[in-house]
Regions:
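A flexible loop/linker signature enriched in serine peptidases of the S9 family
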Residues: 6-22, 33-47, 56-73, 84-94, ...
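Disulfide-stabilized cysteine-rich extracellular repeat microdomains
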Residues: 39, 51, 87-90, 101, ...
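Short loop/turn segments that connect beta-strands within beta-propeller blades
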Residues: 25-29, 76-80, 120-124, 171-173
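Residues that line or immediately flank small-molecule/substrate-binding pockets and catalytic motifs
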Residues: 7, 38, 50, 59, ...
Length: 451
C-alpha cells in the first residue's frame, strides 16, 4: 500500500547527501518524511518490514552516491527515533532486504571480501551465510541478490579476479552457476593475494596482484619486480578482488609485469563504521600512513624492487596520488586521475560540496586551515616525482581546474609532468576509446619510469 524511498528537495548532484526517508501511498498523495539523518551521515536502500510497521535502512558516512556502506537502522513507519541494530560490527552493510521470516538479509563488505549475512532486528543476533573473495554483484554498486519467496533461495551475480560476472542461483552459499555468457573471458593478469598489516592500532588489509606469466617455482630468487600502488576512490569504498571494470587499469599493469598493491586504508569500508569514519578531519595523514606501512608489508612478502615504486588512483585515489608526491620521494613515478589538488579552491568549484562538511567538520569559510592542511598544493614545493595528470573536461565531482592547478604547479617548480584532458568526459569516462587511452597512457608512463 505504501512505498518507502530516500528523497531530497531540488535536483542538484549532491542532494542525496541530505536526503531523508519518505513514505508515500501507492495510490498517490503527499510524501511524508519519517526520518532525517544527522549531518554527518547519509542514508540508503530503505526496506519495509514484513508487517509494514517499520522501515530498515543503511546509514553511515558515505562519500559517493552509489557506494553504500554503514550500519543497519530501523525506524517506525510513522516516524520517530531510529535504532542502530548492528552497532560495532566489523563490516559494512552494502544492501538489505527484509523477507517474510522477519530477519533482515544484507550484504556485507568485510576485510576486502564480500558476503551475505542476516540480523535479527529484535536481538541484534548476527549470522554470516556466505563470505569470500570477489563480489556478489557487477562492478560494486547496487543490490546484489534476488531472493525467492521461501527466503532461502536466491539468484546472485558472482565475480572475482579469476572469474568474470555470471548469474548463480540456489540456496544461499550453495549456489550453482547457471549462465556462462562470459566464459570466453580469461584473466590476463596474475594472482591476487590478500595481505594484512597493522598501523596506529588498526588491523589493515589490501590486495597484492602479482605479475602475470611468471613461473614462481622457477623464478630467480634474486629477481625483483616493480610495483604500482593503486588507491581506490571514495574514500568510502573498498577494494575487492573483483573482475575489472573499464576503469581498472591495475590489471593491465599486472599483465605488463608489475606487482599492483591495492590497499584499504582507514576511511574504507570493510572494518565497521568507526573505521570508515577514522579519516574524518584527517585526510592525507592517517590514511597515507596506512598506505605507506602497507607498502612496507608488501615488500616483506614479495620480490618487489623498492626503488621502482609507482602510485596511481582516480578520484580519492587521484587525490592520494597528488598528496603522496608532495609528502615523500619514495615513488619513482605517479599517475593522478581526476584528483583534488586544493581543497580551498575545490570547495567553490565542485557540484557535490555537501560531502565536505561531514568529512572536514566545517565549511571552508568557517575553517579554511583544516582544508589547507590537507591540500597537496600547500606542499607542492616538495614534489619531485614525475607525474602524469588525467581528467575529463566535464568532471563535476573532481573538476578539471583541480588537475590544471596541480599540473601548472609542478611545471612551475620544474618537476616533470604531463596533463591530458579528455573531451566530453565526466568523472567516470564512458567513451571506450578514452577508457582504452587511459589504460595505455598509464602503462606507458610507468613503463618509461619504472622498467
Amino acid at each position: 500500500k505504501n512505498f518507502a524511498t530516500t528523497a531530497a528537495h531540488g535536483n542538484g548532484d549532491d542532494n542525496w547527501y541530505v536526503a531523508q526517508i519518505y513514505t508515500i501511498a501507492a495510490a498517490g498523495g503527499e510524501m511524508k518524511s519519517i526520518y532525517t539523518p544527522p549531518v554527518d551521515s547519509q542514508i540508503a536502500v530503505p526496506a519495509w518490514s514484513p508487517d509494514g510497521k517499520s522501515v530498515a535502512f543503511i546509514s553511515g558516512i558515505m562519500s559517493d552516491e552509489p557506494a553504500v556502506g554503514g550500519d543497519i537502522f530501523i525506524v517506525p513507519a510513522q516516524g520517530g527515533e531510529a535504532k542502530n541494530i548492528t552497532p560495532g560490527i566489523k563490516a559494512s552493510a552494502s544492501w538489505l532486504t527484509w523477507p517474510s521470516d522477519g530477519k533482515i538479509l544484507f550484504g556485507e563488505d568485510v576485510d576486502g571480501e564480500s558476503g551475505v549475512a542476516k540480523v535479527d532486528p529484535t536481538s541484534g543476533a548476527l549470522e554470516t551465510l556466505a563470505r569470500g573473495p570477489g563480489e556478489l554483484n557487477a562492478y560494486g554498486w547496487g543490490t546484489a541478490i534476488s531472493l525467492a519467496a521461501d527466503g532461502k533461495t536466491a539468484a546472485v551475480i558472482r565475480q572475482s579476479l579469476a572469474h568474470p560476472p555470471e548469474i548463480w542461483a540456489g540456496v544461499i552459499n550453495e549456489w550453482k552457476q547457471i549462465t556462462s555468457r562470459n566464459a570466453a573471458l580469461k584473466p590476463a593478469w596474475g594472482e591476487a593475494k590478500s595481505i594484512h598489516w597493522q598501523n596506529d592500532g588498526f588491523n589493515l588489509q589490501g590486495w597484492l596482484l602479482y605479475p602475470a606469466n611468471v613461473d614462481w617455482a622457477k623464478n630467480d630468487p634474486a629477481k625483483k619486480y616493480p610495483m604500482v600502488v593503486q588507491v581506490h576512490g571514495g574514500p568510502s569504498s573498498m577494494q575487492h578482488s573483483a573482475w575489472p571494470g573499464p576503469h581498472s587499469f591495475g590489471v593491465a599493469l599486472s599483465a605488463a609485469g608489475y606487482f599492483v598493491f591495492m590497499p584499504n586504508p582507514r576511511g574504507s569500508y570493510g572494518q565497521g563504521e568507526a573505521f570508515t569514519r577514522a579519516n574524518v578531519k584527517d585526510f592525507g595523514y592517517g590514511d597515507f600512513r596506512d598506505i605507506m606501512t602497507g607498502i612496507d608489508q608488501a615488500l616483506k612478502q614479495a620480490p618487489i624492487d623498492e626503488h621502482r615504486l609507482g602510485i596511481t588512483g582516480w578520484s580519492y585515489g587521484g587525490y592520494m596520488t597528488m598528496w603522496a608526491v608532495t609528502q615523500t620521494n619514495r615513488f619513482a613515478a605517479a599517475v593522478a586521475g581526476a584528483g583534488l589538488a586544493n581543497f580551498q579552491s575545490y570547495y567553490g568549484e565542485n557540484q557535490i560540496d555537501k560531502w565536505m562538511v561531514p568529512f572536514f567538520g566545517a565549511s571552508v569559510y568557517d575553517d579554511p586551515q583544516v582544508y589547507a592542511k590537507r591540500s597537496p598544493i600547500t606542499f607542492i614545493k616538495n614534489a619531485k616525482t614525475p607525474t602524469l595528470v588525467l581528467v575529463g573536461d566535464s568532471d563535476g565531482e573532481c573538476p578539471t581546474p583541480q588537475s590544471y592547478e596541480f599540473w601548472h604547479a609542478l611545471k612551475t617548480i620544474g618537476t616533470e609532468t604531463e596533463l591530458v584532458v579528455y573531451e566530453h568526459e565526466g568523472h567516470m569516462f564512458v567513451d571506450p576509446a578514452h577508457q582504452r587511452d587511459v589504460i595505455e597512457r598509464v602503462a606507458a608512463w610507468f613503463n618509461q619510469k619504472l622498467k
